[in-house]
């Protein structure tokens, strides 16, 4: 168990994955302040982890969305599948993928998206999302898209 590894000093902190709010609370109770992250799926197409994101924000636990662009087979079509993301991207002259990551970062200070990439240009595009500041009305429009 994680608590045994923590208590033995084998690891300093722990994270969990694919957890619901009850499981996050239970892990926090068992591990105390040593639970530092929750990794759940979260993207424009998959927002059912919103309660977990909100709980992590409340508890100060990092929330790491996996497949933040909707998965490798859906990332390229993100703009066509979610018009609001394409519209905001066009307004900023950036990719819909960059807008998606910036939107996720804007959800809460605890959000750390973990996009995958095999091409240098998409890695650079993802990194640029940290500098893309979305206006409140853009965030509202993106929140509403696909909700």
Segments and roles (model prediction):
Residues 1-147:
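Beta/alpha (TIM)-barrel catalytic core signal, keyed to glycine-rich beta->alpha loops juxtaposed to Asp/Glu
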């Amino acid at each position: 168990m994680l608590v045994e590894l923590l208590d033995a000093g084998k690891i300093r902190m722990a994270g969990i994955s694919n957890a619901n709010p009850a499981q996050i609370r239970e892990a926090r109770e068992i591990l105390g302040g040593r639970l530092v992250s929750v990794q759940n799926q979260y993207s424009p197409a998959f927002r059912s982890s919103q309660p977990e994101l909100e709980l992590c924000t409340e508890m100060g636990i990092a929330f790491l969305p996996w497949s933040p662009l909707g998965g490798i087979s859906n990332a390229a079509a993100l703009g066509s599948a979610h018009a609001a993301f394409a519209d905001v991207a066009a307004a900023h002259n950036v990719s819909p993928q960059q807008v998606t990551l910036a939107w996720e970062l804007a959800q809460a200070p605890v959000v750390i998206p973990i996009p995958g990439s095999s091409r240098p240009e998409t890695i650079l595009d993802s990194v640029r999302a940290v500098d893309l500041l979305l206006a409140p009305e853009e965030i509202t429009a993106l929140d509403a898209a696909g909700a």
